[in-house]
Amino acid sequence: MAKVVGIDLGTTNSVIAVMEGGQPTVVPNSEGFRTTPSVVAYTKNGDLLVGQIAKRQAVINPGNTFYSVKRFIGRKFSEIEQEAKQVPYPVQADGKGNVRIFCSAKDKFFAPEEISAQVLRKLVDSASQYLGEKVTQAVITVPAYFNDSQRQATKDAGKIAGLDVLRIINEPTAASLAYGLDKKSNEKILVFDLGGGTFDVSILEIGDGVFEVLATSGDTHLGGDDFDKKIVDWLIDNWKRIEGIDLSKDKQALQRLTEAAEKAKIELSNVTQTDINLPFITATADGPKHLDQTLTRAQFEQLTSDLIERCRKPVEQALTDAKLSKQDIDEVVLVGGSTRIPAVQQLVKDLLGKQPNQSVNPDEVVAIGAAIQAGVLAGEVKNILLLDVCPLSLGVETLGGIMTKMIPRNTTIPTRKTEIYSTAVDNQTNVEIHVLQGERELAKDNKSLGTFRLDGIPPAPRGVPQIEVTFDIDANGILSVTAKERSTGKQQSITITGASTLDQSEIERMVKEAEKNAEEDRKKREQIETKNLAESVYYQAEKMGLKDNAQELKNAIDQLDYEGMKNLTQQVQTLIAQKASETSNAKTNGKASEKEDVIDADFKAQE
């Protein structure tokens, strides 16, 4: 069977891993790094850049460099208005209220799924190169607290990247697979996952190959980006107070501040103070201005104290839902780069009364777990049973705008639940089923996943018709809803995909565009390689004295005639080989003739 890869599609960085010889292995990217920045950029010429190369040019191209896109995936614009203000690229709503990102270099709008697909494609290309075979199937991880539309959108991103996404699994669950693969004894573990843009807490019982999620909680608006933003705001406020200049209006300066803030945050995990130096941050009539600030760890902890405090409630909620106390937890596993922050580690110790287990690499553990799950699906890994849960309650809107729960949060999936409902008024011939996700009592306060109508109900007094509503959640955590009128057998169903912000025709168009882009990228790479080889052969031909042939090849290079370059390169390489052979033979013959001229003589030793 073809290899199935595991992918951690992160807010800040992404990782891909695969099972090799029964062990999960992280696949390095084409630059040789084990993690790939989740950054996509388009140059002024419209060329696509992904990963480290895109991140490096962000300062000079902030409006066309897209990062932290995971915060927007599967969401409506009304849900992310605050986050949209934190990035230097334009984020807008389309006619349906979906999030769209404007790229001035291409003069077009992109869906977040399209941007994420470019990151996935880079990872998969690296894996295909590494394995020596084309990779088409994957397991992709998502934050445990992602709702249905965010999960579906992640699956769509995989599809646009040319992948068959076999399974969507929760990041903390994947981390537990990596941590507990060789554990034989039963343990209750708490996975504390604070990434670049999301925060999850999951409690699992693991042992003898069974991984059962007992409860999950989280906050999809909390992550390392928010810690960076606190430093950026502090720098902007200080600069405004000292210099009277507002740097938040300058996109290039803002990008430099964001990068400096991330660097300072990382440094403060190891040292107690750091210097932030940004020469030529701006200029006035008096000349250039240079930013030079010192940030201590104590100041950083004070700036981010509200964010640290926000990590507390999901931990307490997960313990309550699992009906456990902190004494029942055997191990605490830290996941995500932001868990390196000392104040975060201290909070975990205070909340759970134990030292966190740091035996796993927080940047790679999720991808490794995804690779193990991929191995299970591919039949490479045996004797593992994964029992995950749905993170949020699912239900329907009933009379009076009430949210009636069908499947409570933390129900083990896959699952199926049926309830009987009826009509609200006499002679009602249709019903509208409004599907909701969330924990609030009123329908309007929860996330709307979609609506559909069941027609053809026979006229009858209110309360008489029996409408059977079935909720079905698959192993990916994606929901299907069916409504059936019992007396007629008429039914209507919906797979909740509308909230993913893309319809099927849009996805198909994006798949074609992505394939076209991949083909264009391949052609560009081929052309660069052809030109590089032609130039190398041209210099060799010059040295060998093949002036006419070299000039002909040089003309093809100057005219960017790639077909001509290919043909002439082959011809000139043949001539170079012939000339080298002739030179070698001439030298050999010369040595032989020299030897023939030598007269052998006997010398007598003098006594």
From Swiss-Prot:
Any one GO cellular component localisation term in the record: chloroplast
Domain of life where this protein originates: Eukaryota
Spans annotated as Disordered: 579-607
GO molecular function list: ATP binding; ATP-dependent protein folding chaperone; unfolded protein binding
UniProt xrefs under InterPro entries: ATPase_NBD, Chaperone_DnaK, Heat_shock_70_CS, HSP70_peptide-bd_sf, Hsp_70_fam
Polar residues bias spans: 579-591
Pfam families from the UniProt entry: HSP70 (PF00012)
Localization per record: Plastid, Chloroplast
Basic and acidic residues bias spans: 592-607
Keyword Chloroplast: yes
Purpose: Acts as a chaperone.
Record-stated family: Belongs to the heat shock protein 70 family.
PANTHER family associated with the record: HEAT SHOCK PROTEIN 70KDA
Full protein name: Chaperone protein dnaK
Native organism: Cyanidioschyzon merolae (strain NIES-3377 / 10D)
Organism phylogeny: Eukaryota, Rhodophyta, Bangiophyceae, Cyanidiales, Cyanidiaceae
